[in-house]
């Protein structure tokens, strides 16, 4: 984070953009690509607010920690960070990312294309931007309200489950976590459905998004990553003051 902040010119006019979604929806990858295009932007990962391993809620039935509930995060610290950004236009330099993000190089996006996007959006996005990606951005109104622009990245259940299964594991503050075979269904998706149901028609997270202040970004396997990226950039441009 410190290196990202070196050239960031954030001011009190900084646009605070949330890029939320279920684990393996692709939100972190999209956020990482977007920050490469934006002229004056920095990226904050909610994953960096996870608690220590022994503080994560313990599930008695499955005898493992539950990393996918709000209580697994230090939400008070996260909210203070959002308030700090809103007050100063800049994230706290002390934040250090844990590196649990797929390499965006696998998409084969050329530097020429990224430069074309930079030229295209330079005149459309003039405010400094802080992007925040996370899996618990819109479960609580008081957290969601802190964002100037709220984007929700979606993908079908089966797609997200397959993506999650392909990951080797995750670095935590104290160790390395690998999903048990049942983890996506019983923890990841179950928690996402429970905490985000109110945003959808019939409280079904596979149904239509109906929350008026949250914009859907579809990122299924059939979606072209370049189109998804441009949709995010268009949404940020439209959210400017």
From Swiss-Prot:
Q: Which GO terms describe its molecular function?
A: ATP binding; metal ion binding; nicotinate riboside kinase activity; ribosylnicotinamide kinase activity; ribosylnicotinate kinase activity
What GO biological process, any one, is recorded here?
NAD biosynthetic process
The entry's ATP-binding residues are 21-29, 163, 167-169, 213-215
EC number of this enzyme: 2.7.1.22, 2.7.1.173
> Signal peptide: which range, if any?
none
Q: What class of enzyme is it?
A: transferase
Specify the protein name. Answer: Nicotinamide riboside kinase
Catalysed reaction per UniProt?
Answer: beta-nicotinamide D-riboside + ATP = beta-nicotinamide D-ribonucleotide + ADP + H(+); beta-D-ribosylnicotinate + ATP = nicotinate beta-D-ribonucleotide + ADP + H(+)
Gene for this protein? NRK1
Which PANTHER family does the annotation name?
URIDINE KINASE
Associated pathway: Cofactor biosynthesis; NAD(+) biosynthesis
Q: Tell me which residues this entry annotates as catalytic.
A: 47
Annotated binding of Mg(2+), by residue:
28, 47
The GO cellular component terms are: cytoplasm
- Name the positions where substrate binds: 47-50, 67-68, 164, 169-170
Q: Is this entry keyworded Metal-binding? A: yes
Give the protein's biological function. Catalyzes the phosphorylation of nicotinamide riboside (NR) and nicotinic acid riboside (NaR) to form nicotinamide mononucleotide (NMN) and nicotinic acid mononucleotide (NaMN).
């Amino acid at each position: 984070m410190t290196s990202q902040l070196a050239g960031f010119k954030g001011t009190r006019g900084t646009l605070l953009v949330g890029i939320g979604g279920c684990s393996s929806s692709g939100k972190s990858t999209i956020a990482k690509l977007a920050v490469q295009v934006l002229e004056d932007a920095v990226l904050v990962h909610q994953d960096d607010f996870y608690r220590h391993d022994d503080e994560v809620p313990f599930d008695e039935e499955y005898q493992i920690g539950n990393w996918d509930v709000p209580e697994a995060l230090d939400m008070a610290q996260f909210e203070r960070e959002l308030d700090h950004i809103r007050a100063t236009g800049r994230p706290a330099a002390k934040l250090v990312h844990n590196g649990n993000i797929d390499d965006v190089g696998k998409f084969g996006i050329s530097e020429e294309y990224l430069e074309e996007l930079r030229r295209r959006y330079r005149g459309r996005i003039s405010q400094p931007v802080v992007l925040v990606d996370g899996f618990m951005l819109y479960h609580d109104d008081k957290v969601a309200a802190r964002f100037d622009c709220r984007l929700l990245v979606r993908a079908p259940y089966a797609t997200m489950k397959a993506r999650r299964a392909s990951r080797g594991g995750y670095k935590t503050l104290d160790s390395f976590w690998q999903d048990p075979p049942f983890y996506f269904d019983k923890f990841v998706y179950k928690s996402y459905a429970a905490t985000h149901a109110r945003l959808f028609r019939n409280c079904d997270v596979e149904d239509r998004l109906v929350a008026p202040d949250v914009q859907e970004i579809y990122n299924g396997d059939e979606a072209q990553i370049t189109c998804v990226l441009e949709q995010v950039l268009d949404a940020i441009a439209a959210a400017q003051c």
